[in-house]
Amino acid sequence: MMALCVMTHAVGVTVAARRLSVEQAARFSQWVWVFIRLAWLIVFLHLVEITLWAVLYLWREALPDLQSAIYFSAVTYTTTGYGDLVLPMEWRLVGAVEALTGILMCGWSAGFFFAVVSQIVHEHD
């Protein structure tokens, strides 16, 4: 599942990098729209990855229903960890792997976002 998340993120970030029209963002208001679109794309990628983990939990009957699986996955992926919903003992290590994956993917997203912002600011300084 971790590999699937990495592939999903890699494809999404690559598509974003190729489609962003950094050169066309000449004014501040245009930059803002580039940042907003990029932020939404990043959020969408994370939601897809959270859903992939949730489907795994549901498919393997580690959680009772889709709502619980998505909720648990979101809380785990973001490392919020409320603890109100837990996996069965044999699945707890998988939950930890999801949390590590979430940390890595969020870090990757932050780095990518920073790189785009830096490029825009540098090119239009």
For each predicted feature, which ranges?
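Transmembrane helix-loop junction
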Residues: 18, 22, 58-59, 115
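Outer-pore turret/helix-boundary of cation channels
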Residues: 48-72
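Transmembrane alpha-helix boundary and packing residues in multipass membrane permease domains
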Residues: 14, 54-58, 111
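Interfacial helix-start motif at the membrane-water boundary
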Residues: 32-48
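Pore domain of cation channels
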Residues: 1-5, 9, 68-124
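Helix-boundary and loop/linker segments of multi-pass membrane transporters
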Residues: 26-32, 84-88
